[in-house]
Structures are given as C-alpha cells and as structure tokens.
C-alpha cells in the first residue's frame, strides 16, 4: 500500500509542472453575483500565469480550449446569432473570452 501511495505522489509531482493557466485562491468572505445566483460566497483569486495573450493557448489533457472570439459567454449560452459558429463545439478544456 505504501508503494502505491508513493507512486501516486511521484506522478502528481511530475505532472505539477504542467500548469498552463491557473489561479491561487484562499478563503474569503467576499460575496459576488453570478449569472444564476446572487450573494455567493467565494474564495478570492489571484491570476498566476497568464494576464495577456501570447499568441497561442495551451491544450490541457489533449483538449484544446474554445475561443469565443467576438462572442460573449452570455451570448453563446443564450443563443446570440453572432455566436453560431460555436454551436458545433461539444468538448473543450477551458473557455477563452476576449475582453471588449
């Protein structure tokens, strides 16, 4: 059993340097409004790696991200015709939304 746990710990440490984007979070009493709920208690987050576009996005576990382009997340979910080219997308690792 100890060997299995040691092996699992080694694998986790080996994969730990493969972070593409990430956030550091800690406990907080901050409340925010989300699309579906109001006054949700969340952890505060600090952007760790990416704060500007470098020309390419990392795939995570072999899945490419989905870039919304000129479409907003809300427009994509609500069916804005501007987002029609995203209809066939069924699998992605994370969502990239451009600031506008």
Curated annotation (Swiss-Prot):
Residues spanning the signal sequence: 1-16
* List of glycosylated residues: 26-27, 39
GO terms (molecular function) for this protein are: host cell surface receptor binding
First-listed, main subcellular location of the protein, grouped into a coarse class:
virion
Membrane topology, record value: Single-pass type I membrane protein
According to its UniProt entry, one GO biological process term is: clathrin-dependent endocytosis of virus by host cell
Share the record's PTM remark.
In natural infection, inactive HA is matured into HA1 and HA2 outside the cell by one or more trypsin-like, arginine-specific endoprotease secreted by the bronchial epithelial cells. One identified protease that may be involved in this process is secreted in lungs by club cells. Palmitoylated.
User: GO CC annotations?
Assistant: host cell plasma membrane; membrane; viral envelope; virion membrane
Q: Where in the cell is it found?
A: Virion membrane; Host apical cell membrane
Q: List keywords of the entry alphabetically.
A: Clathrin- and caveolin-independent endocytosis of virus by host, Clathrin-mediated endocytosis of virus by host, Disulfide bond, Fusion of virus membrane with host endosomal membrane, Fusion of virus membrane with host membrane, Glycoprotein, Hemagglutinin, Host cell membrane, Host membrane, Host-virus interaction, Lipoprotein, Membrane, Palmitate, Signal, Transmembrane, Viral attachment to host cell, Viral envelope protein, Viral penetration into host cytoplasm, Virion, Virus endocytosis by host, Virus entry into host cell
Pfam families listed in its UniProt record: Hemagglutinin
Which function does this protein serve?
Binds to sialic acid-containing receptors on the cell surface, bringing about the attachment of the virus particle to the cell. This attachment induces virion internalization of about two third of the virus particles through clathrin-dependent endocytosis and about one third through a clathrin- and caveolin-independent pathway. Plays a major role in the determination of host range restriction and virulence. Class I viral fusion protein.
The misc remark on file is:
Major glycoprotein, comprises over 80% of the envelope proteins present in virus particle. The extent of infection into host organism is determined by HA. Influenza viruses bud from the apical surface of polarized epithelial cells (e.g. bronchial epithelial cells) into lumen of lungs and are therefore usually pneumotropic. The reason is that HA is cleaved by tryptase clara which is restricted to lungs. However, HAs of H5 and H7 pantropic avian viruses subtypes can be cleaved by furin and subtilisin-type enzymes, allowing the virus to grow in other organs than lungs.
How it assembles, according to the record, is: Homotrimer of disulfide-linked HA1-HA2.
The similarity annotation says:
Belongs to the influenza viruses hemagglutinin family.
Protein name per the record: Hemagglutinin
